[in-house]
């Protein structure tokens, strides 16, 4: 049985080093898809690079934890910027959901303005769209716009609550991450998905070249290791040998 594998590189637009890494992993590796931060400091550079790589499917990386929002968000920003205090607000059930709804729509329109088309799918920076308070907003929006959504089903209490016409992969894995990146780890992710009987799988990744922005990230040099693994010819062969076909959210 042929299975669909979506290898999605997060953080397109974060920095030039991140952008170049994603393009390299698409052109000479197994990355088939990426998600862009429309408020990223290098988003214009990402748009420019993407024009020369039409095979790269591009979705939107909804941002609520970094940089400046596109709309006024007094309930979520501090000194005009977004940050990781969103976790505290979520725990206190104090998220400004109306502001978040408006910001999602604004980032979506900005994506279309930048890339000239709809995103293939939605996900989010630091997985904030999986917060119980935010997920229904994003799921409803994706279904209404006819675009797919990254869904990590582990935090979900009931798949039956999803909109009937919402598209997603059957499986999602964030396990290809950390200090022990290797081909063996990537293939283990595939094998685990196969054992669960999933016919489609998205694997998240963050391939990049290190620049000054990436140096400031808590997740820095493993991004280079990811790039090495994702451009390995032997990995591409092993994926095909396991019955996986590389594709994107266009295929779900």
Swiss-Prot record:
<dbReference type="InterPro" id="IPR022948">
    <property type="entry name" value="COD_ChbG_bac"/>
</dbReference>
<dbReference type="Pfam" id="PF04794">
    <property type="entry name" value="YdjC"/>
</dbReference>
<dbReference type="GO" id="GO:0005737">
    <property type="term" value="C:cytoplasm"/>
</dbReference>
<comment type="function">
    <text>Involved in the degradation of chitin. ChbG is essential for growth on the acetylated chitooligosaccharides chitobiose and chitotriose but is dispensable for growth on cellobiose and chitosan dimer, the deacetylated form of chitobiose. Deacetylation of chitobiose-6-P and chitotriose-6-P is necessary for both the activation of the chb promoter by the regulatory protein ChbR and the hydrolysis of phosphorylated beta-glucosides by the phospho-beta-glucosidase ChbF.</text>
</comment>
<dbReference type="GO" id="GO:0046872">
    <property type="term" value="F:metal ion binding"/>
</dbReference>
<comment type="subunit">
    <text>Homodimer.</text>
</comment>
<keyword id="KW-0146">Chitin degradation</keyword>
<dbReference type="GO" id="GO:0019213">
    <property type="term" value="F:deacetylase activity"/>
</dbReference>
<feature type="binding site">
    <location>
        <position position="61"/>
    </location>
    <ligand>
        <name>Mg(2+)</name>
    </ligand>
</feature>
<dbReference type="GO" id="GO:0052777">
    <property type="term" value="P:diacetylchitobiose catabolic process"/>
</dbReference>
<keyword id="KW-0624">Polysaccharide degradation</keyword>
<feature type="binding site">
    <location>
        <position position="125"/>
    </location>
    <ligand>
        <name>Mg(2+)</name>
    </ligand>
</feature>
<keyword id="KW-0963">Cytoplasm</keyword>
<dbReference type="GO" id="GO:0036311">
    <property type="term" value="F:chitin disaccharide deacetylase activity"/>
</dbReference>
<keyword id="KW-0378">Hydrolase</keyword>
<dbReference type="GO" id="GO:0000272">
    <property type="term" value="P:polysaccharide catabolic process"/>
</dbReference>
<keyword id="KW-0119">Carbohydrate metabolism</keyword>
<dbReference type="InterPro" id="IPR011330">
    <property type="entry name" value="Glyco_hydro/deAcase_b/a-brl"/>
</dbReference>
<protein>
    <recommendedName>
        <fullName>Chitooligosaccharide deacetylase</fullName>
        <ecNumber>3.5.1.105</ecNumber>
    </recommendedName>
</protein>
<keyword id="KW-0460">Magnesium</keyword>
<dbReference type="InterPro" id="IPR006879">
    <property type="entry name" value="YdjC-like"/>
</dbReference>
<keyword id="KW-0479">Metal-binding</keyword>
<comment type="similarity">
    <text>Belongs to the YdjC deacetylase family. ChbG subfamily.</text>
</comment>
<comment type="pathway">
    <text>Glycan degradation; chitin degradation.</text>
</comment>
<dbReference type="GO" id="GO:0006032">
    <property type="term" value="P:chitin catabolic process"/>
</dbReference>
């Amino acid at each position: 049985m042929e299975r669909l594998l979506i290898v999605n590189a997060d953080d397109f637009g974060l920095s030039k080093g991140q952008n170049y890494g994603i393009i390299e992993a698409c052109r000479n590796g197994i990355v088939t898809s990426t998600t862009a931060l429309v408020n990223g400091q290098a988003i214009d550079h990402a748009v420019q690079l993407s024009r020369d790589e039409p095979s790269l499917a591009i979705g939107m990386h909804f941002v609520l934890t970094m940089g400046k929002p596109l709309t006024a968000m007094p309930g979520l920003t501090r000194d005009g910027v977004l940050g990781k205090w969103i976790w505290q607000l979520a725990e206190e059930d104090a998220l400004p959901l109306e502001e978040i709804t408006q910001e999602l729509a604004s980032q979506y329109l900005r994506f279309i303005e930048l890339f000239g088309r709809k995103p293939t799918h939605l996900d989010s920076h630091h997985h904030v769209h999986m917060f119980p308070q935010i997920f229904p907003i994003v799921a409803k929006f994706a279904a209404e716009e006819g675009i797919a959504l990254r869904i990590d089903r582990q935090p979900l209490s009931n798949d039956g609550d999803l909109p009937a016409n919402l598209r997603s992969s059957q499986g999602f894995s964030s396990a290809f991450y950390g200090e022990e990146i290797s081909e063996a780890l990537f293939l283990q992710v595939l094998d685990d998905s196969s054992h669960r009987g999933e016919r489609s799988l998205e694997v998240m990744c963050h391939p990049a070249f290190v620049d000054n922005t990436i140096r400031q990230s808590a997740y820095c040099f493993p991004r280079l290791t990811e790039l090495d693994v994702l451009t390995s010819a032997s990995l591409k062969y092993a994926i095909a040998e396991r019955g996986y076909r590389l594709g994107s959210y266009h295929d779900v």
